[in-house]
Amino acid sequence: MGFREKLKLYVITDRRLKPEVKSVRQALEGGATSIQLRIKDASTKEMYEVGKEIRRLTQEYDALFFVDDRIDVALAVNADGVQLGPEDMPIEVAREIAPNLIIGASVYSLEEALEAEKKGADYLGAGSVFPTKTKRDVRVIRIEGLREIVEAVSIPVVAIGGINVENVKQVLSAGVDGIAVVSAVMGASDVKKATEELRKIIEEVLG
């Protein structure tokens, strides 16, 4: 499975919903192809310890592993990449610091998408496709905005924001390479089953 294909089901951790390591294992068992460690309120040491465990699991399941924002932690745990938002380290600086990391850019408009591609992002996390409880005050681009981004860039696009089993087919119809989810998996009573259900639909649409 190549890099682009490994973006098809991208699961993001949220400790408000589930503890990271156990839920990541369950998501990987269910067919997650990428994992992102997102912790906003932990010490660097804790992020490192959790990151090491997730790195081990993602290697075991041949999945990609990304760390949100923290390039230092990504390098320390030998992650595959880092996800950077508009308020994080600039893409071109991150590339200088960590030339071998895959850099994902979170974008919320067509202009931001084009700028991120120009600056050297390897893939885009584009959203929010729908309103979401995970992030407040987020811009909603809907399917139309998502499709505009997909058609304008040549790098892979992963859709994010309010995606679940009910709307995933609609999202995939925009031509994205994959979907990123938080609550659709981490908020489920059965993480493995929720991941399996999403993966099944993705395989039906993307193959």
From Swiss-Prot:
Pathway: Cofactor biosynthesis; thiamine diphosphate biosynthesis; thiamine phosphate from 4-amino-2-methyl-5-diphosphomethylpyrimidine and 4-methyl-5-(2-phosphoethyl)-thiazole: step 1/1. It is an enzyme of class 2 (transferase). Binds 1 Mg(2+) ion per subunit. Its cofactor is Mg(2+). Mg(2+) binds at residues 69, 88. Pfam families: TMP-TENI (PF02581). It comes from the Archaea. One of its GO terms (molecular function) is thiamine-phosphate diphosphorylase activity. Keywords: Magnesium, Metal-binding, Thiamine biosynthesis, Transferase. One of its GO terms (cellular component) is cytoplasm. 2-[(2R,5Z)-2-carboxy-4-methylthiazol-5(2H)-ylidene]ethyl phosphate binds at residues 132-134, 162, 182-183. Belongs to the thiamine-phosphate synthase family. NCBIfam families: thiE (TIGR00693). This is Thiamine-phosphate synthase. It comes from Pyrococcus abyssi (strain GE5 / Orsay). The lineage of its organism: Archaea, Methanobacteriati, Methanobacteriota, Thermococci, Thermococcales.
